[in-house]
């Protein structure tokens, strides 16, 4: 397959996903493609935090990304070559299709993906790979799903938590690699946000139950900010508490805070707690007060190697708008490390 054929195949995936997601958006009881329905049912069983709404949200984003125009604009920025390499990809499983971007980049570069899937997110990507294979019989030359261990690879892209990332570095240190570890995302509020801004922030926090590296786990607030304003905007997401895994985490940390005598604010389904940390437990959102822009920039500088993205109304440079953290573009590389450049520099 040449680049044009690979782009066309991904475009067909995008059209297929978008058509089904449009159906679902119009009527959640719509009958979707049988293969999508089956993969969603399996995914919900695989991961207790996966549910149909969030899965469809992720599929819709990929449906919007995977179109010929986007993919041409994206690939035109790189000197795509046909050097053959096998790229091992170790995927995480915290949110739906979280490792799919690595596959897309590898496929666009004309290299073979040897994928170690997370047991918590297998069915969705397997369905898409099956769909791609139905479009072009040569697709099998570009992907291999491996078992417990990666074999016959020239480079590695691995995503995990801080502990597993350290293990990856030791194991793959002789190979070109991208090793990703835990990162978190933060929001900055100055008190001038609209209701829509705060509604968007709530989505950035609670979508996927706060499990993504782009999920907002910490909010920086101006001193004197009324926390009730935040809690009121959160209310639309009150049903997160109906997920038993989320509820158990929420209750566990609430109990810990009570036993330790920590100060916190509780609305019955989420907790606001003051902390200098940026990575908060599920069900808890950390906050920290700041005095001015100079101080907030200093605070962010200290934590920059642990921050994935920043949401604000242009309070700081390179921040994104409220409500957009869970809809990254194809150019939003995790950890700001250009996967395409990495792949194309392999010798």
Where are these regions (language model features)?
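Conserved NAD(P)+-binding/catalytic subdomain of aldehyde/semialdehyde dehydrogenases
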Residues: 86, 136-225, 332-346
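Donor nucleotide-activated moiety binding/catalytic core segment of transferases
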Residues: 76-94, 146-152, 164, 269-284
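Hydrophobic packing residues within well-ordered alpha-helices of enzyme cores
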Residues: 125-128, 168, 230
């Amino acid at each position: 397959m040449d680049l044009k054929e690979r782009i066309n195949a991904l475009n067909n995936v995008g059209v297929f996903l978008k058509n089904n997601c449009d159906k679902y958006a119009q009527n959640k009881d719509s009958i979707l493609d049988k293969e999508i329905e089956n993969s969603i049912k399996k995914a919900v069983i695989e991961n207790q935090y996966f549910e149909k709404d969030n899965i469809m949200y992720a599929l819709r984003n990929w449906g919007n990304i995977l179109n010929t125009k986007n993919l041409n604009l994206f690939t035109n920025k790189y000197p795509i070559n046909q050097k053959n390499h096998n790229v091992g990809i170790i995927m995480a499983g915290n949110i739906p299709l979280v490792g799919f971007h690595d596959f897309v980049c590898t496929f666009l570069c004309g290299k073979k993906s040897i994928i170690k899937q997370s047991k918590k997110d297998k069915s969705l990507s397997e369905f898409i790979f099956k769909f791609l294979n139905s479009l072009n019989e040569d697709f099998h030359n570009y992907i291999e799903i491996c078992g417990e261990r990666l074999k016959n690879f020239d480079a590695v892209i691995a995503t995990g938590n801080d502990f597993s990332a350290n293990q990856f570095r030791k194991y793959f240190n002789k190979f070109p690699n991208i090793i990703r570890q835990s990162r978190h995302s933060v929001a900055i509020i100055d008190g001038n946000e609209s209701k829509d801004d705060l509604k968007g922030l709530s989505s950035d926090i609670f979508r996927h139950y706060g499990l993504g590296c782009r999920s907002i786990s910490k909010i920086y607030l101006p001193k004197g900010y009324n926390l009730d304003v935040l809690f009121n905007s959160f209310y639309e997401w009150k049903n997160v508490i109906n997920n038993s895994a989320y509820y158990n985490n929420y209750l566990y940390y609430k109990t810990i805070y009570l036993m330790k005598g920590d100060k916190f604010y509780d609305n019955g389904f989420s907790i606001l707690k003051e902390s200098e940390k940026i990575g908060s437990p599920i069900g808890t959102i950390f906050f920290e007060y700041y005095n001015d822009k100079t101080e907030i920039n200093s605070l962010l500088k200290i934590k920059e190697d642990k921050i994935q993205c920043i949401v604000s109304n242009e309070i700081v440079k390179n921040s994104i708008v409220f409500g957009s953290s869970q809809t990254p573009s194809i150019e939003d590389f995790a950890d700001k490390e250009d996967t395409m450049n990495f792949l194309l520099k392999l010798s």
